[in-house]
Design a protein with these regions (language model features):
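Short, basic (Lys/Arg/His-rich) helix/loop patches that form interaction surfaces
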Residues: 3, 53, 71-76, 95-168
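Alpha-helix N-cap/helix-start motif at helix boundaries, enriched for small hydrophobics
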Residues: 4, 8-13
Length: 168
Protein backbone atom coordinates (compact mmCIF):
# COMPACT_ATOMS: atom_id res chain seq x y z
CA UNK A 1 0.00 0.00 0.00
CA UNK A 2 2.79 2.44 0.89
CA UNK A 3 5.03 1.66 -2.11
CA UNK A 4 2.92 0.32 -4.99
CA UNK A 5 5.13 -2.76 -5.35
CA UNK A 6 3.96 -5.98 -6.96
CA UNK A 7 3.55 -8.93 -4.60
CA UNK A 8 6.65 -10.75 -5.90
CA UNK A 9 8.68 -7.55 -5.50
CA UNK A 10 7.56 -7.18 -1.88
CA UNK A 11 8.57 -10.80 -1.21
CA UNK A 12 11.94 -10.14 -2.87
CA UNK A 13 12.88 -7.15 -0.70
CA UNK A 14 15.94 -7.60 1.49
CA UNK A 15 17.16 -5.44 4.35
CA UNK A 16 20.07 -4.38 2.13
CA UNK A 17 17.51 -2.84 -0.26
CA UNK A 18 16.05 -0.54 2.40
CA UNK A 19 17.47 2.74 3.68
CA UNK A 20 15.46 3.51 6.81
CA UNK A 21 17.23 6.79 7.53
CA UNK A 22 16.66 8.36 4.10
CA UNK A 23 13.36 6.47 3.65
CA UNK A 24 13.74 4.81 0.29
CA UNK A 25 13.98 1.27 -0.99
CA UNK A 26 15.51 -0.25 -4.09
CA UNK A 27 13.45 -2.79 -6.02
CA UNK A 28 15.96 -5.24 -7.53
CA UNK A 29 14.25 -8.63 -7.64
CA UNK A 30 11.02 -10.55 -7.53
CA UNK A 31 10.09 -13.92 -6.05
CA UNK A 32 7.85 -16.28 -8.00
CA UNK A 33 6.95 -19.94 -8.19
CA UNK A 34 8.10 -21.69 -11.36
CA UNK A 35 5.51 -24.40 -11.98
CA UNK A 36 7.60 -26.12 -14.65
CA UNK A 37 10.50 -26.63 -12.23
CA UNK A 38 8.36 -26.90 -9.08
CA UNK A 39 10.71 -24.40 -7.42
CA UNK A 40 10.44 -20.93 -5.96
CA UNK A 41 12.80 -18.65 -7.86
CA UNK A 42 14.34 -15.26 -7.28
CA UNK A 43 14.58 -13.26 -10.46
CA UNK A 44 14.33 -9.82 -12.01
CA UNK A 45 11.28 -7.58 -11.68
CA UNK A 46 8.56 -7.78 -14.31
CA UNK A 47 10.14 -5.07 -16.47
CA UNK A 48 13.69 -6.22 -15.58
CA UNK A 49 14.56 -2.77 -14.23
CA UNK A 50 15.91 -1.69 -10.87
CA UNK A 51 13.99 1.25 -9.40
CA UNK A 52 14.03 3.43 -6.30
CA UNK A 53 10.84 4.04 -4.32
CA UNK A 54 10.53 6.65 -1.56
CA UNK A 55 8.39 6.01 1.51
CA UNK A 56 7.23 7.97 4.55
CA UNK A 57 7.34 7.84 8.32
CA UNK A 58 4.52 5.31 8.68
CA UNK A 59 6.26 2.62 6.63
CA UNK A 60 9.62 3.48 8.20
CA UNK A 61 8.09 2.77 11.61
CA UNK A 62 6.57 -0.51 10.43
CA UNK A 63 9.90 -1.65 8.96
CA UNK A 64 11.90 -0.71 12.09
CA UNK A 65 9.46 -2.72 14.21
CA UNK A 66 9.65 -5.69 11.81
CA UNK A 67 13.45 -5.68 11.91
CA UNK A 68 13.48 -5.73 15.73
CA UNK A 69 10.87 -8.50 15.75
CA UNK A 70 12.96 -10.62 13.36
CA UNK A 71 15.99 -10.32 15.64
CA UNK A 72 13.85 -11.35 18.62
CA UNK A 73 12.37 -14.34 16.77
CA UNK A 74 15.78 -15.47 15.54
CA UNK A 75 16.92 -15.56 19.18
CA UNK A 76 13.74 -17.29 20.41
CA UNK A 77 13.81 -20.04 17.76
CA UNK A 78 17.55 -20.61 18.14
CA UNK A 79 18.77 -23.42 15.90
CA UNK A 80 15.27 -24.04 14.58
CA UNK A 81 15.08 -20.56 13.04
CA UNK A 82 15.18 -20.84 9.25
CA UNK A 83 17.71 -19.02 7.15
CA UNK A 84 17.05 -18.17 3.52
CA UNK A 85 19.39 -18.97 0.66
CA UNK A 86 19.59 -18.86 -3.08
CA UNK A 87 21.55 -20.97 -5.49
CA UNK A 88 22.56 -19.88 -8.98
CA UNK A 89 21.45 -22.35 -11.63
CA UNK A 90 22.64 -22.19 -15.25
CA UNK A 91 20.76 -24.09 -17.94
CA UNK A 92 20.46 -23.57 -21.67
CA UNK A 93 22.19 -20.16 -21.65
CA UNK A 94 19.83 -18.97 -18.92
CA UNK A 95 20.66 -18.12 -15.33
CA UNK A 96 18.08 -18.27 -12.57
CA UNK A 97 18.22 -18.40 -8.79
CA UNK A 98 16.45 -21.08 -6.79
CA UNK A 99 15.23 -20.29 -3.28
CA UNK A 100 15.90 -22.56 -0.30
CA UNK A 101 15.48 -22.28 3.45
CA UNK A 102 17.31 -24.32 6.05
CA UNK A 103 17.20 -24.30 9.81
CA UNK A 104 20.31 -24.14 11.96
CA UNK A 105 20.52 -27.92 12.27
CA UNK A 106 21.00 -28.46 8.53
CA UNK A 107 24.30 -28.35 6.69
CA UNK A 108 24.56 -25.48 4.21
CA UNK A 109 25.79 -26.51 0.75
CA UNK A 110 28.81 -24.56 -0.53
CA UNK A 111 26.90 -23.15 -3.51
CA UNK A 112 24.18 -21.54 -1.35
CA UNK A 113 24.29 -17.81 -0.60
CA UNK A 114 22.34 -16.42 2.36
CA UNK A 115 19.81 -13.68 1.64
CA UNK A 116 18.11 -11.53 4.28
CA UNK A 117 14.49 -11.01 3.26
CA UNK A 118 12.22 -8.46 4.90
CA UNK A 119 8.98 -10.45 4.70
CA UNK A 120 9.46 -13.48 6.90
CA UNK A 121 7.25 -15.74 8.95
CA UNK A 122 8.02 -15.98 12.65
CA UNK A 123 10.18 -19.08 12.04
CA UNK A 124 12.37 -17.20 9.54
CA UNK A 125 10.95 -18.73 6.34
CA UNK A 126 10.18 -16.37 3.49
CA UNK A 127 6.54 -15.28 3.31
CA UNK A 128 5.78 -16.64 -0.15
CA UNK A 129 3.57 -14.71 -2.58
CA UNK A 130 1.21 -17.71 -2.85
CA UNK A 131 0.54 -17.57 0.91
CA UNK A 132 -0.30 -13.86 0.73
CA UNK A 133 -2.58 -14.46 -2.28
CA UNK A 134 -4.42 -17.17 -0.34
CA UNK A 135 -4.85 -14.85 2.66
CA UNK A 136 -6.22 -12.09 0.39
CA UNK A 137 -8.72 -14.50 -1.21
CA UNK A 138 -9.81 -15.72 2.20
CA UNK A 139 -10.29 -12.17 3.50
CA UNK A 140 -12.21 -11.29 0.34
CA UNK A 141 -14.63 -14.18 0.95
CA UNK A 142 -15.07 -13.61 4.69
CA UNK A 143 -15.30 -9.81 4.88
CA UNK A 144 -18.12 -8.34 2.78
CA UNK A 145 -16.37 -4.95 2.46
CA UNK A 146 -13.36 -6.69 0.87
CA UNK A 147 -15.32 -8.52 -1.82
CA UNK A 148 -13.12 -8.85 -4.91
CA UNK A 149 -9.99 -7.72 -3.05
CA UNK A 150 -6.62 -9.04 -4.19
CA UNK A 151 -3.09 -7.86 -3.43
CA UNK A 152 -2.77 -6.02 -6.74
CA UNK A 153 -5.62 -3.73 -5.58
CA UNK A 154 -3.07 -2.09 -3.27
CA UNK A 155 -0.93 -1.19 -6.28
CA UNK A 156 -3.93 0.49 -7.93
CA UNK A 157 -4.72 2.37 -4.70
CA UNK A 158 -1.13 3.60 -4.49
CA UNK A 159 -1.24 4.89 -8.07
CA UNK A 160 -4.62 6.55 -7.54
CA UNK A 161 -3.32 8.31 -4.42
CA UNK A 162 -0.21 9.50 -6.27
CA UNK A 163 -2.27 10.94 -9.13
CA UNK A 164 -4.78 12.61 -6.81
CA UNK A 165 -1.87 14.29 -5.01
CA UNK A 166 -0.49 15.78 -8.23
CA UNK A 167 2.01 13.19 -9.45
CA UNK A 168 2.43 12.94 -13.21
Amino acid sequence: YFTGLRLGEVAGLTWQDINLEEQYLIVRRSVRYNGARHKTEIGPTKRKKVRVVDFGDTLAGILKTAKKEQRKQRFQYGQLYHRNYYKEVREKNRVHYEYYNLDGTQEIPMDYTEIFFVCLRSDGCLELPSTVETACRSASRKVPQLEGFHFHTLRHTYTTNLLSNGAQ
